[in-house]
Amino acid sequence: MNKIRKFFRGSGRVLAFIFAASVIWLLFDMAALRLSFSEINAGLLKEDIIRREHTGFRVEPDQVKVLYTSIRGMGLPRNGAWGKENFRKAENHELKVEENMDQVQRKGKMQNLLGRRKAVPLWHLAHLQTLPVTIPMQKTQGRDSKPEVSSQYMMSKWMTVLESEKTPFTASRGVPLTKIAGRTETFDKKQEAPQNYNVSSDTSKQASERTLNMTISVKTDRSKQKSQTVTKLRMHFASPPILKSEEVTVIKKAEAQSKDLKHEALKALPLLKFIADMGHLKNQSTNETQLGRLPEDDAAKVAPGKKLNFSESHVVIITKEEELKTDTKEVPNSKTQTVFPKLLGGSPHKQIPRNQSKTSSSPPALKKAVSQSKPTISGGLHTARSNLTAKAPTVGYQQSHANIPENPGMHHVFRIDVTLSPRDLNAPGQFGRPVVVPPEKKKEAEQRWKEGNFNVYLSDLIPVDRAIEDTRPAGCAEQLVHNDLPTTSIIMCFVDEVWSALLRSVHSVLNRSPPHLIKEILLVDDFSTKEYLKADLDKYMSQFPKVRILRLKERHGLIRARLAGAQNATGDVLTFLDSHVECNVGWLEPLLERVYLNRKKVACPVIEVINDKDMSYMTVDNFQRGVFTWPMNFGWKTIPPDVVAKNGIKETDIIRCPVMAGGLFSIDKSYFYELGTYDPGLDVWGGENMELSFKVWMCGGEIEIIPCSRVGHIFRNDNPYSFPKDRMKTVERNLVRVAEVWLDDYRELFYGHGDHLIDQGLDVGNLTQQRELRKKLKCKSFKWYLDNVFPDLKAPVVRASGVLINMALGKCVSIENITVTLEDCDGSSQLQQFNYTWVRLIKHGEWCVAPIPEKGSLTLYHCDNRNNRLKWLHKSASAFHPELVDHIVFENYQQLLCMEGNFSQKTLKLAACNPMELQQKWKFEKYYEV
C-alpha cells in the first residue's frame, strides 16, 4: 500500500490525474466518433433514397423482366393475391423483426429471394411462343370442376413486369431476345422440401393500396406439422418508404447473415422467375421453383365443393321498387382547381390539386428517414427472406403518410400482367392468335353461334386469362403518370353473356390493372336467364374480394343497368366496360391520368378488335376518332394523312373525339352526376353515347381517345339481347329524344335523313326535365359544337335556299299577301327568299307553300313539320322518279302533281307531272350537300 501511495505524492499525483483525464477524454472522443459515423450513415441513407426518388427507381438494364403466367380453362380460380382466404392470412403472421432475424441466424436457412443474383436477360411477351419452355398441359376446367392448384402458383401470381421507371425493351417480331431453358430441380430426401405455396395479401383498411403484398407459406411434411413462411414481398409502385433506424440496422444485419447461406437455401427452391421493384434494394434476382401440383390434402382446401358463405356485399339484389336515382345532390361537387392543358396531348408533368380520396402514396422526400419508432407488423417494404426450417412470419413497416408533400411525384405506366398460374404456351388463342374450328366440330360451333352471336365454341376453348400482344404505340411506356391517381370502380353490365367471354373480361381487368387503383369491379346482371350466370357466377366471383355482383329483379336495359352500377360505385372515377372485352397491358393508368388532370375530361381507350369468328386479337389503324353521320349513326373516321403530317401528330398523341362509342370510357363520378348521368328517359340501349357526348362537350367537358390505352372488344354483326319492344323503334325513339333536347334547329337535319321518324309520331316522353337541366348547366348551342368540336361535319340547316327560279321562264316565285306569284327575279327582295328544308317544306319565314290539289292551286300555310300536306319532293325524287329530278313534286295525292309556272298570268298551279314540260322545272339559288 505504501508503494502505491508514493505514486500520488508530489509530481506523481499530477501524472495520475493527467493519465485519468486522458483515458476519460479518449472514451468521450470514441463515443463522439461513433455518433458521427451514425449520423453520416443516416445521411447517406437519406441521400441514397432521395436520389432513387429523383431518378425514378429505375430498373437497371441487367435486371429482370419476367415470364407472364396464367391459368387455362374456366374452373374456379386459385386463391391468389386476389383471393379472400389469402387476404385474411396476412393478419395471422405477426412477429417482431428481431425475432425473425434471430430465427434466420439460428436455422442458417435464410435466403434473400430478391438478393444479388444474376438477372435473366430482357425478353418480350410477343416471343413467348419461340421460347423452349416446357409446361405440362392442363385439362380444361368446367364451371363445376375441381380446381387444381399447382405448386408453382405461389410465385406465378407475381410473374409480371413492373416497369415503374424503365422503358420496355422490345425486339423485332419473331426474334426472341433470349432463350430461357426450363429445368426441374430435385430435392434431397434429407432436405425439407417445400410442398405447397399459398399466396395471400393484406386486406387491412389501413394498409397502403399503393403497394402489393405477397405472403408465401411453405408447408413441409405433415408428420412434422410445421408451417413455414418463406417471405413477404412488398412491390412498390411509386415512391420509397420511410425506413426507421432500427429497421435499417436489422435489414443490413440480415443481409450480411444471409449472404453466406444463399447457396444452401437456393437448393431448396425449384425453377421460377419473378421480379419485384424494390426501392431500397439495388439488385434483383430470380428464384426457382419446381413445376408440380399440390398434394391432395392441400388441394382439397380450395375444392369447389366447399360451402361458400357469400357476404351481403358480394351479391346485391335490386328490386323494381328501388328507383334509379339521378339526383345530382347524391354526389357532392368536387371543389377542385381544373386545369386544361394548352395542347391536345398536354404535358401531365404539372401537379393538379384534387380534392378527393386518393390512393396512398409514399412521400418522395424523407424528412424522418431515421426515426426512433419501433417496427410494426403490417404490409410494408422489407427485404425478402426465406426461412425453410422454422415458422417465421413475415414482417414489414407501417408507412406514415402524415407529411405527404404537395407534389406526390410521377412514375412510368406499369406494364402489369398478373396471372394465377403459368400459361400454356400452346393453348388455343394464346397471345391473341386466331383459332380454327376442327372440321368435326364445325356443326357444333355453328349451333352455338346464336348463344352470343360470335364463335362461342372457340371462346370456351381459349384460356380465360390468355396473353395478348402489347399493341401500344412505341413511347407509351415512357410516359409518366402521377402517383396519386384516383381510384376507379369498373362497371360491367351484362345479360345472358357467354360464360367464357364474361370471365375473360373480368380476368383481363384483374390481371393487367394496378390493384391499388381498382376500388371494385361491379358486375350488373340485367336479369339474366342463364343458370350459369346465377349460383355458378356467384361462386366463381367470390374468389375475388373486389368483385361484386348487382342483380336487377327485372330487365332494365343497358342504360339503367349502368345507372344502377354508378349508384353502388364507391370509386372516385367510373370506368364503364362491356362484358366481352380484353384489357391490354397499361390500359388503366392513362385513362385515370387524364381524369386526374381535368375532372371534366372523359377518357376513352382505343377499342381494338377481337374477331368474332376466330377470336384473334387485332389492332386497329391509328388516328381514328368517333364521329357520326346523319341521322346520328355512329362510326369511326381516320384523320387524313396530310392532316397528320401537317400538324406533326404522333401515334401517342391524344385525340379529341366528337362522339364516343359509349361502351368503354372513364369519367369522374361527381362530374357524371353533375351532368345528370344518362338521360333516364332513354330505353334499353341506343343513343346514350350520343346524348352523353353532346352533354359533355356542350356543357364544358371534353372527350378524348387515349392511344396508350388499348382494350379489345368482340364486334358482332348483331347482338343476341332481347328488347321489351321492337329493337329498331326503341333505338329510334331514343335518338329522337336526344335530337329534341340537344340539336336545336339542326334537328330538322336529323329528321330529314329519317323522315319516317316524324311520320311515326313516336312517344318520346316528357322532355321538360332534360331541357331544364341543359339551361341549368348553361350548355352551349349545337352550332357551337359543330364549329368547335366537329367542324368537318357537313350540317347545313336547310337543303336549299335563295330565290326559286323557273328554268323555262327565268322568273322567280314571290309572295303577295297570302298567295304565291311569279315575278321578275330580285335577289335583294325578301319576298323572294325561300328555304327548302330537310323535312321537305318550302318555307318563307313561318309560312310554307301549300298545295290545294282539288283546285290545282297553291297558297301559304303555317309550317308544321308533321303535316304531310306541306311536303314537296325536289332533287330527292330522283331515286324513284329520276326523270323528275328538277321538278317540285307533290306525291301525297292520287297521282303525282308538279308545280308549274304561268308567267302570262303570273300564277303558279298544280298539274300532272310531265318530264318534258320545261315550265315544271325549277332550281333554287343555292344547294347544300351533306
From Swiss-Prot:
Region named Catalytic subdomain A: 485-594
UniProt feature, compositional bias: Polar residues: 193-209, 353-363
Residues reported in the UniProt entry to bind Mn(2+): D578, H580, H713
Organism superkingdom: Eukaryota
Residues with glycosylation annotation: N198, N213, N283, N287, N309, N355, N387, N568, N766, N817, N835, N902
Domain Ricin B-type lectin: 794-925
Cofactor: Mn(2+)
Protein name: Polypeptide N-acetylgalactosaminyltransferase 5
Species of provenance: Mus musculus
Classification of source organism: Eukaryota, Metazoa, Chordata, Craniata, Vertebrata
Gene that encodes the chain: Galnt5
